[in-house]
Design a protein with these regions (language model features):
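Short boundary/loop segments of OB/S1/cold-shock single-stranded nucleic-acid-binding domains
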Residues: 20-26
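Short coil-to-beta-strand transition motifs
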Residues: 26-34
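Buried, small/hydrophobic-residue-enriched core segments of structured protein domains
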Residues: 27, 41-306
């Protein structure tokens, strides 16, 4: 449950906390931009829906100081991620929930293979971020043994030559890239045990923090689906309005289902929503609610199920 730690009218820098885990206040979530907090929107039972920040024309970031991950220990890595509001990007199994700093994982898993429907290739995002990705992997390896899962067709040297991790190559159909499937095949979670899972985009976020001392939540996502004019990739910032990403790309605005994620496991959303920190693709497909055939599926037919 999030607890908002800012008020409307406050000025925040990129990297300053917007909200924290109510059950574990040390786990904070960083603002992706510097600017003025314009609104804190709540839903039923005062559930926090979003914190809106109007970005400054000139961005400023809180400086947490550059760090040499090679000389850090696990406790120092945890503390750095907590201070910068990035620790919340780590999930734990079982239950796939955000973890806490007092949890001791037996292993950490990162899957760089994205094989869900219409998913983008992580190597596109990795290009130009190789140093940050390796720094993030090294930092995680200080906490626990770290496994990196890659696809048999992925060619990036930053993946195949990754250091301080155990590399596992997966070949097969979806869900071979699912991190839970990889955990089950490599180091299953037994009773009383916990493993951490980290999205590869978050690994880059971690690496940037240690290399530059600043929070940088830029990422590359896939914009796909049959209702997108030109499917491709978009370099965006976490928290960007979806209207700015797909607004001009949609073939039509009615009878379209916009999905944050992939068609199988993503969630239905709207253009008024914002890009989530764990989102790697935005999908637009037909809603299927514009069929006005009399009696619908009851009618006998030869080219469709009835």
């Amino acid at each position: 449950t999030p607890k908002v730690v800012v008020r409307e009218g406050d000025h925040v820098n990129a990297g300053d906390a917007l909200f924290a885990n109510k059950a574990c206040p040390d786990v904070k979530f960083a603002s992706p931009v510097s600017g003025i907090v314009t609104a804190i929107e709540r839903g039923e039972r005062r559930k926090v829906l979003c914190v809106k920040v109007k970005a400054d024309a000139v961005q400023t970031s809180t400086d947490f100081g550059k760090k040499n991950v090679e000389t850090m220990d696990g406790a120092a890595v945890k503390q750095a991620l907590l201070e910068a509001g990035l620790f919340g990007y780590i999930n734990q199994l079982p239950y796939a929930v955000s973890t806490t700093p007092d949890t001791t994982p037996k292993a950490i898993f990162v899957s760089a293979l994205r094989d869900m429907p219409l998913a983008g290739d992580f190597e596109v995002e990795l290009a130009g971020n190789e140093e940050a990705f390796q720094a993030g992997l090294t930092a995680l390896s200080k906490i626990a043994k770290t496994y990196l899962g890659v696809g048999v067709d992925q060619q990036s040297a930053a993946l195949s030559n990754a250091k301080n991790v155990e590399l596992n190559v997966f070949d097969g159909p979806c869900p071979a890239g699912n991190v839970g499937v990889q955990v089950n095949n490599i180091d299953p979670v037994n009773k009383g045990e916990v493993v951490w899972t980290v999205d590869p985009s978050a690994v880059i976020f971690f690496g940037r923090l240690f290399l530059t001392g600043k929070v940088n939540l830029h990422k590359v996502i896939a914009v796909a689906g049959s209702e997108i004019k030109t499917p491709g990739y978009a370099d965006v910032l976490v928290g960007t309005p979806l209207s700015a990403i797909v607004g001009e790309q949609l073939k039509q605005t009615e009878h379209v289902r916009l999905i944050e994620g992939n068609p199988l496991t993503g969630k239905k959303t709207t253009q008024e929503a914002y890009l989530g920190g764990h989102t790697s693709e935005i999908t637009a497909i037909p809603e299927g609610d514009d069929n006005e055939e009399m009696l619908g599926w009851i009618m006998p037919r030869t080219n469709d199920f009835s």
